[in-house]
């Protein structure tokens, strides 16, 4: 059974679950040390095209996928043959394989690659070097690698760290700074940022400016600000929402902020498959309220085809506040 993300991870004060945090802290030291050693031992491979890595320093929920989409779109519009590369988390195929939206399902290649493959060439590969080289052989002149900041196997031309810009209500993207499993960090913040070329702060749909204290946390690092925007109106009338992402509560907030008449909302674990019984439960709940069903695009691609007709996907897109800053980074690597 997949477990959901503990919300107490993201409380800046570290006050919730003090006993749990204390008990898990020795495992955090082990995790951080193992990650550091693995990265230090690696010799990154040159794959024949510039690789832009979109990663993060937390366990999930930062918003990498919308940034990957926006980078692929930007590069494609500039005439670059940009391909996406993902590990394919949640899928059974190891790759390298190019995602085929007709032949593959989320159970094969993972939900995020399947979603992105609707618009861009996408590859999944457990071996990122093999996946990148396969993309180059297929004509890629640039590769956008999703979630590879702690993967040292591929030589990166540009490393971008995405950070969740939600800081309201005591929430903080790094929690109290502890490494997994005592906190949300994949590695200590300073260690992760030392390998990055820039930070992207991704703001929720209803936040105007990034928190000043958050910007201070990055020191002298270049920081780009992007914002999530609705790519379509929310469905009309009462809705029962559901989402299985790292931070499902963000979807509930975003739908409400966009004017959706949510009468109920159900969170599920990230990348989890939806069983027929679960979907029937959601449909029954919606029937009680005489409501529709709404979810994210990422969740929608995990639904069986018959259920996709009964659920409305609500798409969001990332938009950079200063496109010129992104352009300067891309020009710096010859793109």
Swiss-Prot record:
Q: What is its EC number?
A: 2.7.1.130
Pfam families recorded: LpxK
One molecular function GO term is:
ATP binding
Q: Which GO terms describe its biological process?
A: lipid A biosynthetic process; lipopolysaccharide core region biosynthetic process
* Alphabetic keyword roster: ATP-binding, Kinase, Lipid A biosynthesis, Lipid biosynthesis, Lipid metabolism, Nucleotide-binding, Transferase
Q: Where does ATP bind?
A: 58-65
Pathway info: Glycolipid biosynthesis; lipid IV(A) biosynthesis; lipid IV(A) from (3R)-3-hydroxytetradecanoyl-[acyl-carrier-protein] and UDP-N-acetyl-alpha-D-glucosamine: step 6/6
Key word Acetylation present: no
Give a yes or no for keyword Cell division in this entry.
Answer: no
Q: Which GO terms describe its cellular component?
A: plasma membrane
Its catalytic activity? a lipid A disaccharide + ATP = a lipid IVA + ADP + H(+)
Report the function annotation for this chain: Transfers the gamma-phosphate of ATP to the 4'-position of a tetraacyldisaccharide 1-phosphate intermediate (termed DS-1-P) to form tetraacyldisaccharide 1,4'-bis-phosphate (lipid IVA).
Q: What is this protein called?
A: Tetraacyldisaccharide 4'-kinase
Organism of this sequence: Caulobacter vibrioides (strain NA1000 / CB15N) (Caulobacter crescentus)
Query: What's the source species' lineage?
Result: Bacteria, Pseudomonadati, Pseudomonadota, Alphaproteobacteria, Caulobacterales
């Amino acid at each position: 059974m997949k477990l959901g993300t503990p919300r107490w991870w993201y409380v800046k004060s570290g006050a919730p679950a003090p006993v749990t945090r204390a008990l898990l802290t020795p495992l955090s030291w082990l995790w951080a040390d193992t990650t550091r050693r693995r990265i230090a031992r690696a010799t990154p491979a040159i794959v024949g095209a510039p690789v832009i890595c979109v990663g993060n320093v937390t366990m999930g929920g930062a918003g990498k996928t919308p940034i990957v989409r926006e980078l692929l779109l930007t590069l494609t519009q500039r005439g670059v043959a940009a391909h996406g590369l993902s590990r394919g988390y949640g899928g059974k195929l190891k790759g390298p394989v190019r995602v085929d939206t007709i032949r593959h399902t989320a159970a094969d290649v993972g939900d995020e690659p399947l979603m992105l493959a609707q618009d861009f060439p996408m590859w999944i590969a457990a071996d990122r070097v093999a996946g990148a080289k396969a993309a180059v052989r297929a004509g890629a002149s640039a590769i956008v690698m999703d979630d590879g900041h702690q993967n040292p196997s591929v030589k990166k031309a540009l490393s971008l760290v995405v950070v969740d810009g939600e800081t309201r209500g005591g929430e903080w993207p790094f929690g109290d700074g502890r490494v997994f499993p005592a906190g949300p960090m994949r590695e200590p913040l300073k260690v992760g940022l030392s390998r990055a070329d820039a930070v992207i702060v991704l703001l929720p749909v209803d936040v105007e400016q990034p928190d000043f204290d958050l910007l201070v946390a990055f020191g002298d690092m270049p920081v780009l600000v992007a914002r999530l925007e609705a790519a379509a109106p929310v469905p009309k009338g009462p809705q029962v929402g559901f989402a299985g992402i790292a931070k499902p509560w963000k979807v509930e907030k975003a739908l409400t902020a966009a004017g959706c008449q949510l009468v109920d909302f159900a969170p599920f674990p990230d990348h989890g498959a939806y069983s027929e019984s679960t979907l029937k439960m959601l449909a029954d709940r919606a029937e009680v309220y005489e409501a529709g069903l709404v979810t994210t695009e990422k969740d929608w691609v995990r639904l069986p085809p018959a259920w996709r007709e009964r659920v409305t996907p609500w798409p969001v897109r990332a938009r950079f506040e200063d496109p010129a800053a992104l352009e300067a980074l891309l020009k710096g690597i010859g793109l």
